[in-house]
Curated annotation (Swiss-Prot):
GO cellular component: extracellular region; immunoglobulin complex; plasma membrane
Region (Complementarity-determining-3): 110-118
Subunit structure, as described in the record: Immunoglobulins are composed of two identical heavy chains and two identical light chains; disulfide-linked.
Organism from which the protein derives: Homo sapiens
Region (Framework-1): 20-44
UniProt-recorded name of the protein: Immunoglobulin lambda variable 2-18
Length: 118
């Protein structure tokens, strides 16, 4: 049975020159149990390309967001190692290997700088 991992982009406007920045995610990604999926988060050379402070959050329906990855590729304690993060150029990615039913959720990327969060 296939099920979708639904994605939304977390956008929190900053201030000054950062106020117009935004991160772009695909509208949805789907996979079947056991498969691997990669979710992209694309910015620009001024944000994602310049900072290693990309985080990923998982939000199952009706629950609060949970931090899954911070600083591009670091996993907090308790997050399974089948979740991994990476970055190439202006695009950060979250890869989920060996999909499980409980992985069905919204996934958000976020970028933190010293003055702004996107």
């Amino acid at each position: 049975m296939a099920w979708a991992l639904l994605l939304l982009t977390l956008l929190t406007q900053g201030t000054g020159s950062w106020a117009q920045s935004a991160l772009t995610q695909p509208p949805s990604v789907s996979g079947s149990p056991g498969q691997s999926v990669t979710i992209s988060c694309t910015g620009t050379s001024s944000d994602v390309g310049s900072y290693n402070r990309v985080s990923w959050y998982q939000q199952p329906p009706g629950t609060a967001p949970k931090l899954m990855i911070y600083e591009v590729s670091n996993r907090p304690s308790g997050v399974p190692d089948r979740f991994s993060g990476s970055k190439s150029g202006n695009t950060a990615s979250l890869t989920i290997s060996g999909l499980q039913a409980e992985d069905e959720a919204d996934y958000y990327c976020s970028l933190y700088t010293s003055s702004s969060t996107f």
